[in-house]
Regions:
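Alpha/beta enzyme core
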Residues: 3-4, 8-159
Length: 159
């Protein structure tokens, strides 16, 4: 497989490369690729499309686009059942949600995050600062910038 000539949708748009994600978002938004590309190129529209999120149905967020439905969920000390959270994810998708925000703040969050990016077609957001505290099992004020960046990198690698 040939290497892509871009890392982000913004970079692709700036280079004049029409990606499959840009084409899909333009169709969903009932606009032409020519209308969408400048908005992506200048940052007025973002198309979150991590290459490790294999089942992603791309969506655009930003200026001149329709409002998206986001659902917040995740495990906590009080509710630790990842299967229940996945049921919530699938219900949200069935009801039309385009984005899922994983606010998990307890336990080993990586398997759940990986399951999300394997099975959930919606855009996925996470909160690396929550996971930094969990991952290192330390208070937030003791974490270094490197600790935080390492967790951000881990989240990106998970999709």
């Amino acid at each position: 497989m040939m290497a892509r000539e871009y890392k982000t949708q913004m970079e692709a748009a700036r280079k004049g490369i029409v990606t499959p994600e840009i084409e899909k978002v333009a169709a969903k938004e009932r606009m032409t690729v020519e209308e969408l590309m400048p908005l992506v190129a200048c940052g007025k529209v973002a198309i979150p499309a991590n290459v490790n999120h294999k089942c992603l149905e791309p969506e655009g967020v930003g200026s001149m686009l329709r409002t998206k439905i986001n659902v917040n969920l995740g495990v906590s000390r009080d509710c630790k059942d990842y299967d229940v959270e996945m049921q919530k994810v699938m219900s949200a998708i069935d009801l039309g949600a385009e984005a899922i925000m994983d606010l998990s703040s307890h336990g080993n969050t990586q398997p759940f995050r990986q399951k999300l990016t394997r099975e959930c077609p919606a855009m996925i957001g996470t909160v690396p600062v929550y996971d930094s505290v969990i991952h290192y099992q330390r208070d937030l004020d003791t974490l270094t910038a490197k600790d935080f960046i390492d967790v951000v990198r881990l989240h990106a690698q998970d999709g």
